Swiss-Prot record:
Pfam families given in the database record: Ribosomal_L1
InterPro entries given in the database record: Ribosom_uL1_bac-type, Ribosomal_uL1, Ribosomal_uL1-like, Ribosomal_uL1/biogenesis, Ribosomal_uL1_3-a/b-sand, Ribosomal_uL1_CS
GO molecular function (one): structural constituent of ribosome
Signal peptide: none
Gene: rplA
The organism's place on the tree of life at top rank: Bacteria
Alphabetized PANTHER family for the sequence: 54S RIBOSOMAL PROTEIN L1, MITOCHONDRIAL, LARGE RIBOSOMAL SUBUNIT PROTEIN UL1M
Family: Belongs to the universal ribosomal protein uL1 family.
General function of this protein: Binds directly to 23S rRNA. The L1 stalk is quite mobile in the ribosome, and is involved in E site tRNA release. Protein L1 is also a translational repressor protein, it controls the translation of the L11 operon by binding to its mRNA.
GO-annotated biological processes: regulation of translation; translation
Name of the featured protein: Large ribosomal subunit protein uL1
Subunit structure: Part of the 50S ribosomal subunit.
One GO location term (cellular component): large ribosomal subunit
Length: 229
């Protein structure tokens, strides 16, 4: 722990906590201050001035990053018949029906994304208490309840991310790995920022983006100037 503390202190010394950096500067600092002994994930965080208690100010959705996430997603699909075969052909890791429901209820959670055809939601609904808190429940808004299971699987494997504002208006998203070239991280960041900007509710008041930051796993949080995006 002592060694990590020294590394964190050294990283903190390189970052001015009172400054909002340009996206290029921030990405460079994330790479420079990373001290994890593995290929750390890079995440961005937005604090939005919204009231999620209002239906028209709830922000949730999905997008495909231009350069992917660098993470291998394990995709589970609830489908039957021809749709199950389409999911398998597209590269789904697990495909099934009631058998998967029983397995998940038994404690198995070795997957990252859950997709379902609309007709399967009746049985998937039984898993609400398990999948809901983990943000794994299929939802039409994120494209995970669909008849086009092949496309959904391919997107999930190819860099699709989901996002959702919490009760305090915070949104977090994975945009890549520290090993990514800086320009690819910048491009992913800008693509996600565009989505956040377009998601601004018409009824939102005041400064929409109260704070934007970027960090790596175990790394330092770095403020970003939204105008640089």
């Amino acid at each position: 722990m002592a060694k990590k503390s020294k590394q964190m202190l050294a990283a903190l010394e390189k970052v001015d906590s009172t400054k909002a950096y340009s996206v290029e500067e921030a990405v460079a600092l994330v790479k420079e201050t990373n001290f994890a002994k593995f290929d750390a994930s890079v995440e961005v965080a937005y604090n939005l001035n919204i009231d999620v208690r209002k239906a028209d100010q709830q922000i949730r959705g999905a997008m495909v990053l231009p350069n992917g996430t660098g993470k291998t997603q394990r995709v589970l699909v609830f489908a039957r018949g021809a749709k199950a075969e389409e999911a398998k052909a597209a590269g789904a890791d697990f495909v099934g029906e009631d058998d998967l429901v029983a397995k998940i209820n038994g404690g198995w959670l070795d997957f990252d994304v859950v997709i379902a055809t609309p007709d399967m939601m009746a049985i998937v609904g039984r898993l609400g208490r398990v999948l809901g808190p983990r943000n794994l429940m299929p939802n039409p808004k994120t494209g995970t309840v669909t008849m086009d299971v092949a496309k959904a699987v391919e997107e999930s494997k190819g860099g699709k991310i989901t996002y959702r504002a919490d009760k305090a208006g915070n949104v977090q998203a994975l945009i890549g790995k520290v090993s990514f070239d800086a320009d690819k991280l910048v491009e992913n960041f800008k693509a996600f920022h565009d989505v956040m900007a377009k998601a601004k509710p018409a009824t939102a008041k005041g400064t929409y983006m109260a704070n934007v930051s970027i960090t790596s796993t175990q790394g330092v949080g770095i403020k970003v100037d939204p105008n640089s995006l």
